[in-house]
A protein has these predicted regions:
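Glycosyltransferases and closely related glycan-assembly transferases
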Residues: 87-101, 108-123, 136-144
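Donor-nucleotide binding loops and adjacent catalytic segments primarily
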Residues: 45-46, 50, 54, 178-272, ...
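A short, well-ordered alpha-helix in the C-terminal region of glycosyltransferases
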Residues: 340-354
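Structural loop-to-beta junction motif characteristic of Rossmann-like glycosyltransferase folds
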Residues: 56, 120-121, 268-269, 286-294, ...
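Conserved nucleotide-sugar phosphate-binding/catalytic loop shared by glycosyltransferases and other
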Residues: 4-12, 34-80, 164, 237, ...
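C-terminal alpha-helical cap of glycosyltransferases
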Residues: 353-372
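Acidic donor-binding loop of glycosyltransferase active sites
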Residues: 97-99, 265-279, 287-288
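Active-site-proximal region of nucleotide-activated glycan assembly enzymes
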Residues: 57, 116-183
Length: 372
């Protein structure tokens, strides 16, 4: 190809920003196998490892986020921003991309800002129901904005805003409604009793202290009620929990869940944080879920995400401050009432958008002037 399609994608800091970026890249490459796709990430953040592992080159810039709890750490921020803007301009001048995509996180701000001032078409992918300040800042010059939630025209220019959903892993996007036979089979494959209810706990790869504390308080009672627990506690908590609790029938504690399709298929109910990517997966998988959003994220966006599903009958919402006292009984109540579980599953499936990556690339294709 004498003139390959060239794209730059920027986003990171958390998996919720990285995975959509990689999914978009994979969909572009599926359509245009010779496309040249490069990433820009924040130095020292997880995208600098995750993106190369997915097969794409990445260049780091020294950008950092604003520290609300340690203001003295912001003294070097202006210099980091200046250096980042300069590096982005150098990269874009050298690469000459036909379009630039931002999937959020503070690293996408300088990338989109510079691209827009260089006249390069930009697309924003906003995962949350409450837009972050970075995406708000650069939205006025964006050529397309793809959102996961409806009614985002209140904060973004309506003419270029499209609700597409968040990209999820293809295996999860393709999941069919789970039958009881499939659920029992998945429990057996995981080593659980197929006839007993299974509670899946997801605290994220880093873990969530409040969720772990609430589950530790509740799980003995759950198992006494003949329920089982697959507990993904995060890498920072797994050793301490194993040391403190040891082994017990009907309970498995692990840092990660490798096969999420199998775990979702086996689960009768899910307890989870409310990150945008996880919620999109829960909807595609048709899960009955209890969401405990982290209050320690920018603009409290997880609470907005959780409430968006809760208000549409697609999930339950428990504030973190109430998790320790409310989680155990809420799980018990719903496991005892299959019709309530099925209502949540139906509500989640109604919000699923399994074709998000494809829809985003459809909009992306309208931006560039490139021809093969």
């Amino acid at each position: 190809m004498p003139n390959p399609l060239r794209l730059v994608i920027s986003g990171g800091g958390t998996g919720g920003h990285i995975f959509p970026a990689v999914s978009i890249a994979q969909e572009v490459q599926r359509r245009y196998p010779e496309a040249e796709i490069r990433f820009i990430g924040a130095q020292g953040r997880m995208e600098m490892e995750r993106v190369p592992a997915a097969g794409y080159p990445i260049s780091g810039i020294p950008i950092a986020g604003f520290q609300r709890k340690a203001l003295h750490k912001n003294l070097s921020l202006p210099l980091k921003i200046w250096k980042s803007l300069r590096l982005v301009r150098q990269h874009l001048s050298a690469w000459q991309p036909h379009a630039v995509i931002g999937t959020g996180g503070y690293v996408s701000g300088p990338t989109l800002f510079v691209a827009q001032r260089m006249g390069i078409p930009t697309l924003i992918q906003e995962q949350n129901s409450f837009a972050g300040w970075t995406n708000r800042l650069v939205s006025r010059r964006a050529k397309a904005i793809c959102t996961a939630y409806p009614n985002m025209e209140a904060v973004f220019p309506a003419a270029v805003t499209h609700q597409t959903g968040n990209p999820v892993r293809p295996a999860i996007a393709q999941m069919l409604p789970i039958t009881e036979e499939a659920r029992r089979a998945a429990k057996t494959q995981l080593g659980f009793d197929p006839e007993r209810k299974l509670i899946l706990v997801l605290g994220g790869s880093q873990g969530a202290r409040a969720i772990n504390q609430a589950v530790e308080s509740a799980e003995t009672g759950w198992r006494s009620a003949d329920h089982q627990v697959l507990w993904q506690c995060g890498k920072f908590y797994v050793e301490a929990l194993h040391a403190r609790l040891g082994e017990a029938p009907g309970r498995r504690i692990q840092a990660f869940v490798d096969d999420m399709v199998q775990a979702y298929t086996a689960a009768d109910i899910v307890v989870s944080r409310a990150g945008a990517g996880t919620l999109s997966e829960l909807c595609c998988a048709g899960m009955a879920s209890i969401l405990i959003p982290s209050p320690n994220v920018a603009e409290d966006h997880q609470t907005h995400n959780a409430l968006s599903l809760h208000e549409r009958g697609a999930a339950l919402h428990i504030p973190e401050s109430q998790a320790f006292t409310s989680l155990a009984q809420t799980v018990e109540d719903y496991l005892a009432q299959p019709e309530k579980l099925e209502a949540l599953r139906s509500g989640a499936r109604a919000l699923a958008q399994p074709n998000a990556a494809s829809d985003i690339v459809d909009h992306l294709q309208t931006l560039w002037t490139w021809k093969a």
